[in-house]
Design a protein with these regions (language model features):
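N-terminal Rossmann NAD(P)H-binding glycine-rich loop of SDR-like oxidoreductase domains
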Residues: 3-23
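Conserved C-terminal active-site "lid" loop/helix of NAD(P)H-dependent oxidoreductases
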Residues: 217, 252, 275-312
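Active-site Tyr-X1-5-Lys
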Residues: 129-156, 162-174
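NAD(P)H-binding glycine-rich loop region in Rossmannoid oxidoreductase-like domains
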Residues: 45-84, 89, 93, 111
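Substrate-positioning beta->alpha
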Residues: 186-192, 206-228, 234-235
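Conserved Rossmann-fold NAD(P)-dependent oxidoreductase catalytic core, especially the SDR/UDP-sugar
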Residues: 89-131, 147-157
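Amphipathic terminal alpha-helices
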Residues: 304, 312-332
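Mid/C-terminal beta-alpha module of Rossmann-like enzyme folds, strongest
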Residues: 162, 230-286, 322-326, 330
């Protein structure tokens, strides 16, 4: 199978190349075009618009996008230019392609909801907050509008069970909404958390009892390979590990991996919220947005994608995957 991966040089893209290149021919589409092991050739976005510049492609995995900026320094229009605009461009190319039959778009759980009081399901009415989630949901809507013209209803796409509508043109589309992605080599909020705990600094947010879903990059690779190789119905699919963990449990996983004792302080929530507010003013690592990410409840159901793939569990459980991620941090 000839597979085109946009954003091929990113964290998820690099992992997908390793996972898929053994049995497929991988092409890249990115803003930079250095050579990469496992990738036959990487094209520029300008080449996408040139006649006969691209090879015959069987499947597209669209990862290219602007990630969530927890420091809030990015202009809103940049999110829409990248997350919405590039999605429209590559999706239009997919729909016009004579050979491509599978399209996987990596959206985000934040496109569905900023906060989740109970469990996030695919049929939720999207209520994103901020340009990151809003730009992703606008990209989703562009895709859904096009699919309706091919006989695939929004209801079928967002059903909590795999849908039954088949596109008239035979082109399947999968919209993945992953929660926080982790894996060896990834940087982000987990790396920040690791930096605090590994230095023996007590964790001051123990008073926040929460549960959240994480997403192992290995499980993402497994799911992508599944929809590419199996007869999986088009649809919106939440992506996450099987188990939800609290931040306190995550601290314990980090300490266990490092052979350290966990020091969790249960400082009153009101005081810590005030500290985060000051951190936002002074542009410190702990600001209100990062505080929310570390303490919020955000549990996402992965029942639909597992049913579509015909599995009961993903290959990597949350604790196992997080330990692998933390062990990688420790080697750096």
């Amino acid at each position: 199978m000839n597979i085109l991966i946009t954003g091929v040089h990113g964290f998820v893209g690099s992992n997908l190349v390793k996972y898929l290149s053994k049995e497929n021919t991988i092409y890249g589409l990115d803003i930079v075009q250095p050579q990469k092991d496992g990738v036959k050739k990487t094209f520029s976005w300008d080449e996408l618009e040139q006649p006969n510049a691209m090879p015959e492609i069987d499947a597209i995995i669209h990862l290219a996008g602007k990630a969530h900026d927890t420091r809030n320094k990015s202009a809103a229009d940049v999110y829409f230019k990248v997350n919405t605009g590039l999605t429209q461009k590559i999706f239009d190319w997919y729909m016009a392609s004579a050979t491509a039959k599978k399209f996987v778009f990596f959206s985000t759980a934040k496109a569905a909801a900023e906060c989740v009081p109970e469990i996030l399901l695919e049929d939720v009415t999207p209520t994103p907050k901020g340009p990151y989630g809003e730009s992703k949901i606008k990209a989703e809507e562009y895709i859904l509008d096009a699919l309706e013209k091919q006989g695939v209803s929004r209801k079928s796409m967002s059903s909590i069970v795999p849908g039954t509508d088949c596109p008239k043109n035979g082109k399947d589309v999968y919209i993945f909404r992953p929660c926080m992605i982790h894996g060896p080599g990834n940087k982000g909020n987990l790396n920040l958390l690791y930096g605090v705990v590994s230095k023996g600094i007590p964790w001051p947010l123990g008073a926040f009892e929460n549960r959240r879903t994480f997403t192992s990059v290995e499980n993402i690779c497994f799911a992508v390979n599944g929809v590419l190789t199996q007869d999986v119905p088009s649809g919106i699919y939440n992506m996450g590990d099987d188990e939800a963990l609290s931040t306190n449990e995550l601290i314990e996983v980090i300490c266990e991996t490092l052979g350290k004792k966990a020091h969790i302080w249960r400082i009153p929530k009101g005081f810590m919220n005030g500290v985060a507010k000051v951190g936002g003013w002074l542009h410190l690592p702990l600001n209100p947005l990062r505080m929310q990410k570390l303490t919020e409840n955000y549990v996402s159901s992965n029942a639909k994608i597992k049913k579509a793939l015909g599995i009961k569990k993903f290959p990597v459980d949350a604790r196992q995957g997080l330990k692998q991620t933390i062990a990688c941090f420790a080697k750096q």
